[in-house]
Amino acid sequence: LVRSRGLGDVYKRQKYNSGLIRHVLIRTNHLLDEVMVVLVLTKRSLEHKDEIVAKIIQRYPVVKSIIINVNNKIGNTILGDECITIYGREYIVDECCGLKFRIGPQSFYQVNHKQTEVLYNKVVEIGHFKQEDFVIDAYCGIGTIGLIVASHVKQVLSVEIVEEAICNAKQNAKNNQINNIHFVCNKAEEQIVKWAKENKKIDAIIVDPPRKGCDSKLLDTIDAVSYTHLTLPTKA
């Protein structure tokens, strides 16, 4: 369709920083009844945009969202910082462990739904949480783990560096009518130290880091905080 509209050199040649389209990202919920299409472009505008949108939704009615993501930087990072919604909503909705979650174009969300539910239920099982517990959810993303744990504890303190994810997390808490969770946009290692200095009660820390793993500063922070704030069984 893009080629037939005469858009010319559409493919992004990373080496020469040329072209228009870098990636096409497809996100879907586990029922496959809501789909998001993210067009990662090197600029904000797309020729024949309305026709392209009409063709997509005509052929695929389950598409609820079409978004342009702008990434004109040299490198292999897939998504840029700016998102422009050109059709439908800014998100799709999925259900996990009985809760509903909004998923945006830049939101981290596990792709294997069945195993994700197994994993999150295992977190609850091995956490041995009590109703009086205060739990930190580091790298919380859109709030999935923290919101699932929230019904088992007194309060969840969640921290995430991505602002869009925090906005989605707050909306997810509201939509699921969960009030005992607090979200902060900050570096996890800095926020945990801040909470510790505020003498926040901490009974457990849940960490779900990005692919590169935990920041070494975070591990040092958890190690330091654990000796003054966590019980021995929780540290183990």
Where are these regions (language model features)?
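Single conserved hydrophobic/aromatic residue that forms the stacking wall/gate
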Residues: 1-7, 11, 229-236
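Internal alpha/beta scaffold segment
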Residues: 5-15, 20, 43-67
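Rossmann-like S-adenosyl-L-methionine
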Residues: 48-50, 54-58, 62-230
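Short, aliphatic-rich beta-strand segments
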Residues: 33-41, 100-104
